[in-house]
């Protein structure tokens, strides 16, 4: 008699089924709490598509005299993303060394460093921009500081996790021969973590290009401010062209 071998163990199947049931119940409860009704989207779908096809499409170009200003705002957005990420990465690297219990000269302080970075990371760049408006005013300075804070907090946690993956044997062997803290960093941490650091750095640049657009819409400068001005002026076809330009960055 042939016996069928289940592809998923019974215990795992029960866990998955229970998880799906919990997620379904949570969806129903949260939808009821927020009064979310998918039928409203379906009923208003025709009006939505009319708005897109009549106001946004086809995309249009602004006046020739304004095109250089748009490209200049795009350059400002890219510069904000690059500069804020670069400054944040340099600061995050040094702070992450103290946030890793494996290499930190003050292991007890590592959890406080990670906790502080987590606190900063949980506050979105848009919120930081609103907080900084009162002291710095509207401009690219606000966008730079807001992006720098969120990027710094994100990369501190990312760099700490990357450092934690370094082999403990490598660090201990350098300690055994009397290597100082800077020597351990230069000989063990950097060679082992450089690729990981670069990956997180490039990822953060990509995220900040999008974030700088959002921050710019509330006064942080760059292409976001230009986009918001066209939306506010009900020039949706030109705004859609700028949206496509942002998507291409």
Provide a role label for each language-model segment.
Residues 1-86, 90, 98, 102:
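N-terminal, non-cleaved signal-anchor transmembrane helix
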Residues 16-20, 234-249:
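A membrane-interface signal for the N-terminal entry of alpha-helical transmembrane segments
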Residues 50-57, 72, 76, 111-121, ...:
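Short amphipathic alpha-helical coupling elements at transmembrane boundaries
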Residues 63, 67, 71, 75, ...:
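Alpha-helical membrane-protein architecture signal
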Residues 85-93, 97, 101, 126, ...:
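Hydrophobic positions within alpha-helical transmembrane segments of bacterial inner-membrane proteins
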Residues 95-128:
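Cytoplasmic-entry segments and transmembrane alpha-helices of multi-pass inner-membrane transporters
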Residues 117-151:
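Generic hydrophobic transmembrane alpha-helix motif, especially the helices
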Residues 139-189, 195-204:
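Membrane-cytosol interface at the C-terminal ends of specific transmembrane alpha-helices
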């Amino acid at each position: 008699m042939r016996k069928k071998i289940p592809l998923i163990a019974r215990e795992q199947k029960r866990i998955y089924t229970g998880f799906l049931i919990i997620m379904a119940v949570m969806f129903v409860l949260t939808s009821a709490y927020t009064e979310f009704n998918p039928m409203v989207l379906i009923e208003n779908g025709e009006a939505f598509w009319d708005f897109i096809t009549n106001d946004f499409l086809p995309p249009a170009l602004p006046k020739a005299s304004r095109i250089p200003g748009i490209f200049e705002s795009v350059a400002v957005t890219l510069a904000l993303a690059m500069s804020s990420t670069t400054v944040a990465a340099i600061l995050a690297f040094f702070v992450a060394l103290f946030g890793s219990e494996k290499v930190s000269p003050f292991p007890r302080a590592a959890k406080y460093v990670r906790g502080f970075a987590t606190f900063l990371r949980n506050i979105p760049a848009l919120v930081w921009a609103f907080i900084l408006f009162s002291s710095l005013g509207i401009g690219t300075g606000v966008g730079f500081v807001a992006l720098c804070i969120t990027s710094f907090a994100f990369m501190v946690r990312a760099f700490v996790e990357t450092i934690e993956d370094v082999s403990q044997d490598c660090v201990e062997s350098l300690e055994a021969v009397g290597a100082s803290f800077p020597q351990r960093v230069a000989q063990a941490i950097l060679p082992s973590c450089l690729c990981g650091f670069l990956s997180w750095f490039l990822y953060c640049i990509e995220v900040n290009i999008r974030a700088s657009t959002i921050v710019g819409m509330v006064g942080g400068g760059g292409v976001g401010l230009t986009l918001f001005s066209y939306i506010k002026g009900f020039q949706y076809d030109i705004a859609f062209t700028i949206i496509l330009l942002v998507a291409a960055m």
